[in-house]
Amino acid sequence: MINKDPFNKVLQDLKKQGRYRVFNDIVRERGDFPKSIWYGPYAIKNIVNWCSNDYLGMGQNKVVIDAMHTALDQTGSGSGGTRNIGGTSHYHVALEHELAKLHGTSSALLFTSAYVANEWTLVALSKIIPNIKFLSDNSNHSSLIERIR
């Protein structure tokens, strides 16, 4: 039998400190940005959600949505694995070429999130530049702070 007491204590401490996370259950309404539907514990409410990472509204753009449907019809859903193991989706390769062209570089690389891009940029820099020093403070994004530590 597993002793759950240590885990329960950590959870209780997080709740007391106000650091226990409860994730909002929402549905974004396509074509009605920034409105969403929030599924709360006691009610369902219409809300305005300005916290989305869809800064440019590309997730609402008909051309983007149509392209996604085409890709889904051709390849199905899901990545099929990491690029290193299962290969890289042709759509990702095409997007990387387009981004490189847009920014006038020889190549581009997609990451799953800005957090991961920040982390691995620091890893690459620290491997390429011997004795590099990173200066940071608590105002930096946690992706930078955690990797610098």
Label each residue range with its predicted role.
Residues 44, 104-106, 129-132:
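Short coil/turn connectors at secondary-structure junctions
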Residues 100, 119-127:
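Active-site-proximal alpha-helical scaffold in enzymes
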Residues 149:
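Pyridoxal 5′-phosphate
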